Regions:
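Select transmembrane alpha-helical segments in multipass membrane proteins
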Residues: 8-19, 44-47, 86-99, 147-153, ...
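Transmembrane helix-boundary motif of multi-pass solute transporters/channels
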Residues: 11-49, 199, 236-239, 250-253, ...
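Loop-to-transmembrane helix boundary motifs in multi-pass membrane proteins
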Residues: 8, 13-14, 22, 147-148, ...
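Membrane-interface "cap" regions at the ends of multi-pass membrane proteins
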Residues: 1-30, 59-64, 68-81, 85-92, ...
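A generic transmembrane alpha-helix motif of multi-pass inner-membrane proteins
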Residues: 378-401, 423-454
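Helix-loop-helix connectors at the membrane interface of multi-pass transporters/channels
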Residues: 1-2, 6, 109-141, 241-245, ...
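Membrane-embedded translocation segments of transport machinery
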Residues: 2-5, 9, 170, 174-323, ...
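Inter-helical loop and helix-membrane interface segments of multi-pass membrane transporters/permeases
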Residues: 3-7, 35-39, 69-93, 106-162, ...
Length: 454
């Protein structure tokens, strides 16, 4: 297998923070707390943790194995390891998924900038609950403002990716991730100090095993899979920048712990604040852009400055979570174009950003001015459906089958143990999960996401 000279992360902490940044995203904040609170609290969290460490980490290690062994972008890595370019279809699925996800995810990321501005200008003050609904609908359906924020947001991942692995991705991760941690801890402490916050803590953390059933188990598996950025090529691309001393198992464990830490702390922000004013939180964009602005104003309404600061910090937190995810998605496609077509990183990044501008504009317009339907879905929802419900589970499944069944066990063992320098007594269990449990789990996630088990 021919390997090319390749950039690498300059430190182990840089590699861990970059990989964790890929995993931490908006889903940690707008989906996990809702799922946990409504499906058994601590019982769901325990189930989720089991799914992360039993299913998620082995798949993550498998992606790390492919990337570091091949020392190539995900679009080329599988073919290089198999000595057969036909296997590149697995990596290309991740490249295409990353490109399409960027097209609509960046739109939502741009919304966070609008809400940062609204926080700074005290635009949420003196509004009634129904005003937040009208304001969000008016903004998201506007043909101009969301597009302006989309373009503004895309500048940041583009600039960071152009700067390269060490000076761009690693350096930014060492800044963005600690700031994100500080913000989420400060916001959680402030939220838990509110009156009646204990009701929110009880809702999130009190175990209710009576709510745990097959549907909740499938939901926990799905949340673990999507939260860790599996199946989209980000982790294998980043792993291609790992040095030979990086311990894949330890790195995967660190990423899993950080991702879960952020998700739980997001719940400690949302539920105490919501219950302090008697509001039942929902999930998704409506939670972030309708419910929470209302919650923050009511919770701190007696002190407008505090309401403004809390809201500002929260939307900065959201923007950072979105940015770390989009950097990794952008890098997946940029690295592939750079290697496959021998073009400069700058030109490759320009092509990716240009595509994101086009698909982002179409995604944004499909929420309002452009009402065209594809299979009964608007363009934004179509991209979300095709990537989240089809491409990512399929990509994760193919990674499991490739590493579990096709790739030589000796290759997996060498990568996991750094050629025998580290011990890996769990290797047989890891291979069993990768061969049998993980594929079955992903198939169940796939059919559940499509609603076939309902």
């Amino acid at each position: 297998m021919q390997k090319m000279d390749r950039a690498s992360f300059g430190s182990k902490i840089g590699a861990i923070l970059a990989a964790a940044g890929s995993a931490v995203g908006l889903g940690n904040i707008w989906r996990f707390p809702y799922e946990a609170g409504n499906h058994g609290g601590a019982a769901f969290i325990l189930l989720y943790l089991a799914c992360v460490f039993i299913m998620g980490m082995p798949i993550m290690i498998a992606e790390f194995t492919v990337g570091r062994r091949a020392k190539a972008s995900t679009g080329r890595a599988f073919g290089l390891l198999a000595n057969n370019s036909k296997w590149n279809v697995i990596g290309m699925l991740g490249v295409l998924a990353g490109l399409l996800i960027l097209g609509y995810y960046s739109v939502v990321a741009g919304w966070t900038l609008e809400y940062i501005l609204s926080s700074v200008t005290n635009g949420f003050a003196d509004k009634k609950p129904e005003d937040f609904v009208a304001a969000f609908q008016s903004f998201s359906q506007d043909p101009i403002r969301p597009v302006v924020w989309l373009l503004a947001f895309l500048f940041f991942p583009h600039y960071i990716v152009v700067k390269g692995v060490k000076d761009g991705i690693e350096k930014s991760s060492k800044i963005l991730m600690p700031v994100l941690f500080i913000l989420i801890v400060v916001l959680a402490i402030c939220s838990m100090a509110l009156p009646n916050a204990n009701k929110g803590l009880e809702f999130l953390l009190k175990p209710d095993f009576s709510k745990v059933n097959a549907d909740v188990f499938l939901g926990a598996m799905g949340q673990a899979f999507f939260s860790l950025s599996l199946g989209m090529g980000c982790l294998s691309t980043y792993a291609s920048y790992f040095d030979s001393d990086t311990r894949l198992g330890k790195t995967a464990l660190s990423v899993g712990v950080i991702d879960t830490f952020v998700a739980i702390l997001a719940g400690l922000i949302i539920f105490p604040a919501a219950f302090s004013v008697g509001i039942q939180p929902d999930a998704g964009p409506s939670l972030i852009f309708i419910t929470l602005p209302n919650v923050f104003q009511q919770a701190f309404g007696g002190i407008p400055f505090l309401a403004m600061i809390f809201s500002l910090l929260f939307y900065v937190l959201l923007a950072l979570a979105a940015l770390t995810s989009t950097i990794s998605l952008h890098e997946v496609v940029t690295a592939y174009l750079n290697e496959r077509f021998k073009i400069s990183r700058n030109r490759a990044a320009m092509l990716v950003t240009g595509f994101c501008v086009v698909t982002g504009i179409l995604s944004s317009l499909s929420l309002g001015a452009w009402d065209a339907k594809f299979f009964s879905l608007g363009f934004f929802d179509l991209l979300d459906f095709v990537t989240a419900k089809l491409m990512l589970p399929l990509g994760g499944l193919l990674v499991c089958l490739f590493v579990g069944w096709y790739l030589k066990r000796s290759v997996s063992y060498e990568e996991l143990t750094n050629y025998g320098l580290q011990k890996a007594p769990y290797f047989p269990i890891y291979m069993f999960i990768l061969r049998y449990f993980a594929p079955i789990a992903i198939i169940l996630i796939f059919v559940n996401e499509l609603g076939w088990l309902s």
